[in-house]
């Protein structure tokens, strides 16, 4: 178990959303990996924060949830009220510790935190990327899963993250080629890479 995992083992959410965001940015590579998305919103009069992995979340469900949350005008709203009255989705639960949040976000759920609340909401709006059952032609002799990559970068990063739910997995996106400006993703495990080069 690495140092970061040990640090979050017993840490519960704070009521201060800025403290929570700081811890989340330490346990998930939000600023380093382009596929981990954070979104700041306002619910009623309170600051709120969402974090999720691009490629796992069903866009239409998230759009409906945001359409339900953004018009809220109540100045004080509890997590219970949000879950039972405002979020139009079935697969919703609360969480109070960062370890569960990290595990669920890396598995594809959306974490929602609201300022002033010491518990958050996990929205299971996952849609795992899937391919047809045929295996790639060139890899018939290899062991393990038979996932093959496709032309879409987000789909490919989600396929990899589905198999490797490690917070140290980083995807960096770059554009290469003078004229083609092709998007290329470099994937690596932060705790194995040689940072000297």
Q: Across the structure, where does each feature detected by a protein language model lie?
A:
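Membrane-embedded alpha-helical signal segments
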Residues: 1-197
């Amino acid at each position: 178990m690495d140092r970061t995992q040990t640090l979050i083992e017993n840490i519960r959410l704070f009521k201060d959303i800025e403290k929570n965001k700081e811890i989340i940015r330490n346990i998930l590579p939000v600023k380093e990996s382009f596929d981990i998305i954070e979104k700041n919103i306002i619910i009623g009069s309170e600051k709120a924060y969402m974090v999720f992995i691009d490629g796992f979340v069903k866009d239409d469900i998230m759009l409906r949830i945001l359409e339900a949350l953004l018009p809220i005008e109540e100045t004080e709203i509890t997590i219970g009220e949000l879950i039972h009255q405002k979020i139009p989705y079935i697969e919703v639960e609360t969480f109070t510790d960062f370890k569960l949040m990290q595990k669920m976000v890396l598995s594809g759920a959306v974490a929602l935190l609201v300022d002033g609340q010491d518990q958050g909401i996990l929205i299971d709006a996952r849609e795992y990327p899937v391919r047809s059952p045929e295996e790639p032609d060139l890899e018939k002799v290899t062991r393990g899963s038979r996932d093959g990559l496709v032309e879409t970068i987000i789909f490919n990063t989600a396929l990899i993250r589905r198999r490797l739910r490690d917070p140290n997995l980083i995807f960096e996106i770059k554009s290469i080629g003078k004229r083609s400006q092709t998007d290329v993703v470099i994937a690596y495990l932060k705790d194995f890479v040689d940072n000297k080069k």
